Amino acid sequence: MFDIGVNLTSSQFAKDRPAVVERARAAGVTGLLITGTDLQESRAASELAQQHANFCWSTAGVHPHHASSWDERVAEQICELAARPRVAAIGECGLDFNRNFSTPEQQEAAFSAQLALAAELSMPVFLHCRDAHARFAALLAPWLDKLPAAVVHCFTGTAEELESCLSLGLSVGITGWVCDERRGLELRALLPQIPADRLLLETDAPYLLPRDLLPKPTSRRNEPCFLPHIVRQVAAWRQEDPEWLGQKIDENARRLFRLE
């Protein structure tokens, strides 16, 4: 089972990153994709991936929260990072109109530029969309025939938005959000609609600790070692065998990100 979304560069992991990786291995996780969210974090993610060869890969990109930092210099350096052997996708990029830490105009410019970069480099894209689906889809659609693959990470949208993502040919990343009895029930009901070959699972650690973990962890910090719990829960809600699903999401991740 492959975790396609781990924020391993987070300061929350500063004291025990090697142990976090080893706990994931011990839990049966077969690989991690470390998320890059700005130039500095993308560089750090790449370096971590190189330290854990054959288990970790990374993305390189600028999250919509940081879109105001996007300029020609950043674009050039993201392009250079993308050439590193363990960088598997451009991103995390997209739109987030929930908080607008960068203006919508800045977000759209950075998103479009990163889609163009991914198309130029023939790399998959690791996508973010929150409260912005119409513009997200409109900006993304013209690029899809030029991109090898795309996954919308941490999907928490509506039935209509899921249908739109699937019609665009996107793969869908599901996190422990779906384990939340307060806000994950709508998403849980949508799980059977996602084709098995388009489903990816992720922890988004250290965020989104599954609320139904038993016994409850003493810390609220999420870790990739909890991915097997998400796999078991999603398998139950999709009425699939958890071992089969774990293998399937590993195959999906390795195919989508073209991992050796």
Curated annotation (Swiss-Prot):
Domain of life according to the entry: Bacteria
Cofactors required: Mg(2+)
Transmembrane segments: none
Pfam families on file: TatD_DNase
EC number: 3.1.11.-, 3.1.13.-
Signal sequence, renumbered to the chain: none
Subcellular localization, as worded in the UniProt entry: Cytoplasm
Binding site for a divalent metal cation: E92, H128, H153
Keyword Hydrolase set for record: yes
InterPro entries assigned to the protein according to its UniProt record, in alphabetical order: DNase_TatD-rel_CS, Exonuc_TatD, Metal_Hydrolase, TatD-like, TatD-type_Hydrolase
Keyword terms, alphabetized: Cytoplasm, Exonuclease, Hydrolase, Magnesium, Metal-binding, Nuclease
GO molecular function, one term: magnesium ion binding
A GO CC annotation given for this chain: cytoplasm
Subunit structure: Monomer.
HAMAP family per UniProt: TatD_exonuclease (MF_00901)
Family that this chain belongs to: Belongs to the metallo-dependent hydrolases superfamily. TatD-type hydrolase family. TatD subfamily.
Function: 3'-5' exonuclease that prefers single-stranded DNA and RNA. May play a role in the H(2)O(2)-induced DNA damage repair.
Protein name per the record: 3'-5' ssDNA/RNA exonuclease TatD
Name of the gene: tatD
